[in-house]
Amino acid sequence: MTKIVVIAGPTASGKSDLAISVAQRFNGEIVSADAMQIYRGLDIGTAKVTKAERELVPHHLIDIVDMTDKFSVAEFVTRADQVINDIAKRGKLPVIAGGTGFYVKALLGQQPLDFVASDEAEVALLKQKSLPTLVTMLKAADTILASRVDLNNKQRVIRAIQIARHGKRQEDISRPTYDALIVGIDWPREILYERINRRAQKMLDDGLLSEVEHIMSVGGESIQAGKAIGYKEFFPYIRGEVTREQALLAVQQDSRRYAKRQLTYLRHQIPGLIWLHGTDAATKLTSEVKAWLD
């Protein structure tokens, strides 16, 4: 069973720095589990590791799709499995740095996956058809799948048609099981919030608005990347609806709320997670990993 280290935690908690530290100490490579760092061109607002940091330790699943593309949790897991297998085959330790809790949960096999990204245009066309027509289409595409679906439920029939056309049933997909050491970084609430506020200000100082303008030029709120905290709050500023300071405060507030949701999710949805205090997380994790590998 492949061993992996998983480092989770809220935004601005220091996951990237800790992952680099562990990867350097234990001959590892880092796999990003962040739903927004997958996008090319979204560097400042997603707090991506720098080029210099990537030269210290190889990083994977960063800058893998264009910002106008959609990307599902199933696609993440498929790619992550491949990368982890490659890292382990080369005798290195896969270190997962995860800001997106449901990515981590899915990778660990703790939740069912939807292996087909939903195509909104296709769904709209299918919804126009009658239920009997849809059932006929499903039976023609996959009789086995049709026998397992509630044929009186139009939404489920539509989803089954999509799976039959484009994807695989989950039971047909064999996934690896990992021996995972899972840790989370925790800070006192006031310290975490201060880290969040400082980082938001630094992003703005570092040129965040150029990324915001680029997102707006290719779709704005209509694309998945345009829904990210740190970007969407500045769209009203670019349109002249709020001040720069108001937009920054909105980013800070939304980021703090998001951090609270992340912590709640990790505490209740990721079994076996070991919490480390942010001030000595590197020292504690080094000890944990050493004992675990031995």
UniProtKB/Swiss-Prot annotation:
Any one Gene Ontology BP term: tRNA modification
Renumbered residue ranges of the record's region Interaction with substrate tRNA: 155-159
Catalytic reaction(s) noted: adenosine(37) in tRNA + dimethylallyl diphosphate = N(6)-dimethylallyladenosine(37) in tRNA + diphosphate
Species of origin: Leuconostoc citreum (strain KM20)
Gene Ontology MF annotations: ATP binding; tRNA dimethylallyltransferase activity
UniProt keyword Metal-binding, yes or no: no
Subunit and partners: Monomer.
Primary enzyme class: transferase
Family, similarity comment: Belongs to the IPP transferase family.
Protein name: tRNA dimethylallyltransferase
Underlying gene: miaA
UniProt KW keywords: ATP-binding, Magnesium, Nucleotide-binding, Transferase, tRNA processing
